[in-house]
Structures are given as structure tokens and as C-alpha cells.
Regions:
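Carbohydrate-binding surface patches
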Residues: 1-41
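C-terminal beta-sandwich/jelly-roll accessory domains of carbohydrate-active enzymes
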Residues: 25-142
Length: 142
């Protein structure tokens, strides 16, 4: 149901990771990403591609936070979706290569119908995420 891969540059200073899922399994909020091809003792900046989500993806759940009722498929929903986009999760960490490869990165919890924020992943059916890892100078992080 889930697949991921990671490819690193020849000098192991940069890597790109990709994770995807086929179908959502209810109440499985935990996810961990494991990199590969990194230097064990190098420090890396791990971050994700920032996403914006259309409010249509939330369906009727948008009414939990909307000041007015928005009927699914209505003109109001159509107009609101043109102007309102919700920020996706932010994954931004600094860690050693061996940590990223062997312990992995615990990703933000998945959305479970309530409590959406930048600390929650909206990870629906057939969703995917890109993660970037770049070697940084260890002295810059002190």
C-alpha cells in the first residue's frame, strides 16, 4: 500500500526522497521516512516540498472551521476554493546522515477528520510527497 525510494548524488551531498500510498487506511497516522545513500557522519538539512490544499479536498469537514455553511458542490464552495488554499505540512529538520538512514524521520501525523494545521499531513488516496536532503556545514547548526 505504501512505497518510497531515495536517490543520492554521486558525492552523497544531496538526495531526493519520494513516498506514496495507494489507499488510506483509517487511523494510521504514523509514518516514517528512511533515506539512503547519505554519508553517516555528515549533517543534512531535511525538508519537504511545500503544498497548498484546495478546500474542496475536505468536503463537508470544511464547515467545522468555516464561519458560514458551505454546501459541497455549490457556487459558494467553488468561489471559496478559488481564493482559499490551506498550507500543507512543514517538515524541516537537521540531522546526521546515519540518523536519516537508520532511525528515519517521523513524519507529521496524518489528518484524521479534525484538527488540521501545518503540523498535520493531508495524505489522501494516491497521495505522494517529495523530500530533499542537502549536506550542510555542521558548524552552521551550532
Amino acid at each position: 500500500n505504501n512505497a518510497s525510494w531515495c536517490v543520492a548524488s554521486k558525492d552523497m551531498s544531496k538526495a531526493v526522497g519520494f513516498t506514496m500510498q495507494k489507499l488510506v487506511v483509517p487511523n494510521t497516522q504514523f509514518a516514517c521516512f528512511f533515506a539512503n545513500g547519505l554519508k553517516d557522519d555528515a549533517v543534512y538539512h531535511f525538508y519537504n516540498r511545500r503544498l497548498k490544499h484546495n478546500i474542496k479536498e475536505f468536503g463537508e469537514l470544511v464547515n467545522m472551521v468555516s464561519p458560514v455553511h458551505i454546501k459541497q458542490g455549490s457556487l459558494v464552495q467553488e468561489l471559496a476554493s478559488k481564493f482559499v488554499k490551506l498550507d500543507g505540512e512543514t517538515e524541516d529538520y537537521t540531522a546526521y546522515g546515519d540518523t536519516l538512514m537508520y532511525a528515519g524521520v517521523k513524519l507529521k501525523q496524518s489528518f484524521s477528520a479534525t484538527g488540521y494545521s501545518e503540523d498535520v499531513r493531508l495524505y489522501q488516496d494516491f497521495a505522494a510527497r517529495l523530500y530533499f536532503m542537502e549536506e550542510v556545514n555542521a558548524d552552521d547548526n551550532a
